């Protein structure tokens, strides 16, 4: 039986912090499925299709190099429902600091009640990526700042193009 892990998030955009989590997660499972949450009330900077393409291009080679199968999907329901749908028994969550832990522990407890067969695995962020958040990356990019230290090169390029084209600031 293969061990399938789900790594959920908005990935708007993919950051080096997300990449750090994936690098660690692929060592824990036979297949990693990255699930992009679609929330009707939120207006993402990147379209669903753009985020799926980013996830595939950035994370896919990392999984392949580790000998881990890889997939990406979207979901618009409960995260545990998305995990069950792909057959995941592990849910991967990255932690930057104590406030992340407090929040994620609450969610993990609720998820465990709803889906006891799915276990949350917390992966602490490596020191160099702890301060990175997608929100801060978007803000820096919107103001014309250099985000190349915080995101993969192709994501930095996509952000530059988004804001140069007069897209949402």
UniProtKB/Swiss-Prot annotation:
Reactions accelerated catalytically: (R)-4'-phosphopantetheine + ATP + H(+) = 3'-dephospho-CoA + diphosphate
Q: State which Enzyme Commission number(s) the record gives.
A: 2.7.7.3
InterPro entries attached to this UniProt entry = Cyt_trans-like, PPAT, Rossmann-like_a/b/a_fold
| Pfam families listed in its UniProt record | CTP_transf_like (PF01467)
Give residues annotated as binding ATP. Answer: 10-11, 18, 94-96, 104, 129-135
**What GO terms describe the biological role, i.e. biological process, of this protein?**
coenzyme A biosynthetic process
Biological or metabolic pathway of the protein:
Cofactor biosynthesis; coenzyme A biosynthesis; CoA from (R)-pantothenate: step 4/5
What are its cofactors? Mg(2+)
Q: Where is this site: Transition state stabilizer?
A: 18
Q: Where is the protein situated, by its record's location annotation? A: Cytoplasm
Query: Which residues does the record give as substrate binding sites?
Result: 10, 42, 79, 93
- This protein's GO CC annotations: cytoplasm
Sorted UniProt keywords:
ATP-binding, Coenzyme A biosynthesis, Cytoplasm, Magnesium, Nucleotide-binding, Nucleotidyltransferase, Transferase
Q: Name one GO molecular function term.
A: ATP binding
- What CDD domains does this protein's entry cite? PPAT
PANTHER family named among the record's database cross-references: PHOSPHOPANTETHEINE ADENYLYLTRANSFERASE
NCBIfam families given for it? Answer: coaD_prev_kdtB, cyt_tran_rel
Subunit structure, briefly? Homohexamer.
- Family as reported in the entry's similarity comment: Belongs to the bacterial CoaD family.
Question: What is the protein's name according to its record?
Answer: Phosphopantetheine adenylyltransferase
